[in-house]
Amino acid sequence: MSGEQYLHWHDGVEFDEATQTWRGYIEDNNVRSNKHLTEQTFDDKGDAIVAASKMLSEARKGRPPA
């Protein structure tokens, strides 16, 4: 995907009850099944937010997650 295709995506975080950790993600606004999670999990929600934001920024620059 080109960076322009990520203009209609958003970032967010989700909490895993089983591990008590957070993960960041980016998701297509129009196709909810099109979602990329951060590889790393985080104990702190703020760290997951930063990771998700960085992932979306990189995708918009033409470097989408694998």
What are the functions of these language-model segments?
Residues T19-T21, Y25-H36:
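Acidic, low-complexity, intrinsically disordered interaction modules
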Residues V31-D47:
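A short, exposed loop/beta-hairpin motif centered on an aromatic-Gly-Thr core
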Residues S53-A66:
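Short arginine-rich
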